[in-house]
């Protein structure tokens, strides 16, 4: 897997950098694993915008991905690697020995024809799913369950992985991609290896239109709005914010304010908090 650059034939190709699709072998998705999904466009059940800058984009069909890996002891072969428009990771199409077909997140290094398993006593190989208590220390895992049987909820984006740091009784300490160290129950399942398509972090859309194809609408700065639309708006010309610091459109402090509850019950499972990203290195824009 590599990235592809373009000559500056047009302004849109001058800075365009995309991943090549050499690892994608299947042109069309498996029909039995595809469903139609209504796109919310950032609206809630009342039609009110709860997530700004969403809407439009190319039509998509949702791929049913197996995050639980609950077919224990049944071998499966990797039949194809498919593209998924809903995530930046690739999907591996599995053909199980009993005839069932399922999608899983394609780990880095997985190949066509490789056999994968899930269960307590399966080999320690990339693509196999095991309980965290059965995985050796120092191993890289992804698609980690937070609760047994609920399915993988953490470490699912392209190029990400968590590392097993220690085993303490019925819990396992995981170092997450955010550098947070968290305790997870040992019977929770995880998949060995890291998620593939790690080169996605080196890509560049190149033009605004490609972002619209992905369903992202323009972000308008608050300082160019009217005072009735944003706390930063109004004034003559390029006026300053007029407050002690930048705020959200609803008047709450932005860029660095902690939003996690202090007395959240799951705080006792966090051994080390994630590394805070400074405002300067984040390069945040005027909300």
Swiss-Prot record:
Complexes and interactors: Part of the 50S ribosomal subunit. Forms a bridge to the 30S subunit in the 70S ribosome.
Keywords tagged on the record: Ribonucleoprotein, Ribosomal protein, RNA-binding, rRNA-binding
SUPFAM superfamilies: Nucleic acid-binding proteins, Translation proteins SH3-like domain
Record function comment: One of the primary rRNA binding proteins. Required for association of the 30S and 50S subunits to form the 70S ribosome, for tRNA binding and peptide bond formation. It has been suggested to have peptidyltransferase activity; this is somewhat controversial. Makes several contacts with the 16S rRNA in the 70S ribosome.
NCBIfam families in alphabetical order: rplB_bact
Biased composition (Basic residues): 258-287
Region (Disordered) location: 221-287
GO biological process, one term: translation
GO CC field: large ribosomal subunit
Species in which this protein is naturally found: Prochlorococcus marinus (strain SARG / CCMP1375 / SS120)
Protein name (Swiss-Prot/TrEMBL): Large ribosomal subunit protein uL2
Family (UniProt): Belongs to the universal ribosomal protein uL2 family.
Span of the signal peptide: none
Pfam families for this protein: Ribosomal_L2, Ribosomal_L2_C
Keyword Mitochondrion: no
Keyword RNA-binding among UniProt keywords: yes
Molecular function GO terms recorded: rRNA binding; structural constituent of ribosome; transferase activity
